[in-house]
Amino acid sequence: MRFQTTLVPARLIRRYKRFLADCQLEDGREVTAHCANPGSMMGLADPGTKIWLEPNDDPKKKLKFGWRLVDHENGHFTGVDTSVPNRALKTALERRAIPSLAAYETVRPEVKYGQNSRIDFLLSGPGLADAYVEVKSVTLCREPGLAEFPDSVTARGAKHLAELAAMAGLGHRAIMLYLVQRTDCDRFTLAADIDPAYARAFETARAQGVEKLILTTHISPQGVEIADML
């Protein structure tokens, strides 16, 4: 998945009200960017952090920049836009680039199911059980090389696990897919100390047949691509 416009570097001044970020461009101008991330962004939103913004000229958008990446200035990047995983995964699923899901011919995003929820992807194919795929973006790293989820309490995430378990109980494939939006991590774990209820919900869902799939990414200012399974 390539970004729609060329990203521009900036320095973060502050993130506030969750979805807003004041930034300084290289020419000294200060702009406010949209931050498409409802999480805590622990370790990613410190003032002075080098970031990459995507400009837009959409007259319908009040904010003319979107915050897409954190640049760790050591060759590694973290993707902070939580809409990116679904866009990148849709491309990978349609190309059948994920081995454990490559047999599915039809990819349907945002299908209603459960209790007023939408599954990120519903996959189907001749002779195959439907596969319900829920996607979570992983950006937290507190120990070198170890990605963690979640970075804040997520009651909604626990609800999604229960709904996946219900689909597994009906004979469908139910898959909890964690997409690691960091290039500096090669391991994954749940952050049970941050959200014990989510960790318990995950173990319950696994016991009821929900599958776990963890994917890494290639990230650069040009775009985000699905890489390997962990």
Curated annotation (Swiss-Prot):
Database matches in InterPro entries: SfsA, SfsA_C, SfsA_N
Disulfide bonds: none
Stretches that traverse the bilayer: none
MF-aspect GO terms: DNA binding
Top-level division of the source organism's lineage: Bacteria
Family: Belongs to the SfsA family.
Protein name, entry field: Sugar fermentation stimulation protein homolog
Organism: Ruegeria pomeroyi (strain ATCC 700808 / DSM 15171 / DSS-3)
